[in-house]
Swiss-Prot record:
It catalyses: [(1->4)-N-acetyl-beta-D-glucosaminyl](n) + UDP-N-acetyl-alpha-D-glucosamine = [(1->4)-N-acetyl-beta-D-glucosaminyl](n+1) + UDP + H(+). It comes from Xylohypha bantiana. It is a multi-pass membrane protein. GO terms for biological process: cell wall organization; chitin biosynthetic process. It is found in: Cell membrane. The keyword Lipoprotein does not apply. Polymerizes chitin, a structural polymer of the cell wall and septum, by transferring the sugar moiety of UDP-GlcNAc to the non-reducing end of the growing chitin polymer. GO terms for cellular component: cell septum; plasma membrane. It holds the Pfam family Chitin_synth_1. Keywords: Cell membrane, Cell wall biogenesis/degradation, Glycosyltransferase, Membrane, Transferase, Transmembrane. This is Chitin synthase 2. It comes from the Eukaryota. Belongs to the chitin synthase family. Class II subfamily. The gene is CHS2. The lineage of its organism: Eukaryota, Fungi, Dikarya, Ascomycota, Pezizomycotina.
Length: 189
């Protein structure tokens, strides 16, 4: 759940940044209404229970509802929707409006079976992409912690040039507190 909350809290900090852009014609205080976060878990037996607990604490997931089959037909996936007003940071502390957190529209897709990453991407683009018709999609792996303005800068690349079809952000190693992560040769390199 640490990796998940690191990523999710980073996304929510980015949404707060979009909402702080009061002079923008696109964003502003209600900018969160233009953003939907889709979380796709690859297999009900594979997702860590503490990650589900983190999603439940945010109001996005409800335990005990998912069934293997309905009307004698196998279930492919379980979809939960919720607009949360709290975030869990990577230390598992709640952050709300008093800490600058804005609401976040979430869709959580819990796939019944592990069908791997490419299948999850198909779910995202073919199911949720068709339903939501987004202008910009940003894919993040769990554990990635976006800087507080990173998603804005990615969005801006698309906004400024309609010929842009794809963009990639810069990935930096997390150096840790007091840069202690640099003692690890993989991080230091």
């Amino acid at each position: 759940e640490i990796e998940f909350t690191r990523t999710m809290h980073g996304i929510m900090r980015n949404i707060s940044h979009f909402c702080s852009r009061t002079k923008s014609r696109t964003w502003g205080k209600d900018g969160w209404q233009k953003i939907v976060v889709c979380v796709i878990a690859d297999g009900r037996q594979n997702v860590h229970p503490r990650t589900l607990n983190a999603l439940a604490a945010m109001g996005v997931y409800q335990d005990g509802i998912a069934k293997n089959e309905v009307n004698s037909k196998e279930v492919t996936a379980h979809v939960y929707e919720y607009t949360t007003q709290v975030s869990l940071d990577e230390t598992l502390k709640f952050k709300g409006a008093e800490k600058g957190t804005v609401p976040c529209q979430d869709v959580f897709c819990l796939k019944e079976k592990n069908k791997k990453k490419l299948n999850s991407h198909r779910w995202f683009f073919n199911a949720f992409g068709r339903a939501l018709t987004p202008n910009v999609c940003i894919l993040l792996d769990v554990g990635t912690k976006p800087d507080s303005k990173a998603l804005y800068h990615l969005w801006k690349a698309f906004d400024q040039d309609s010929n842009v079809a794809g963009a990639a952000g810069e990935i930096k190693a997390d150096k840790g507190k007091g840069w202690m992560g640099l003692l690890n040769p993989l991080v230091a390199s």
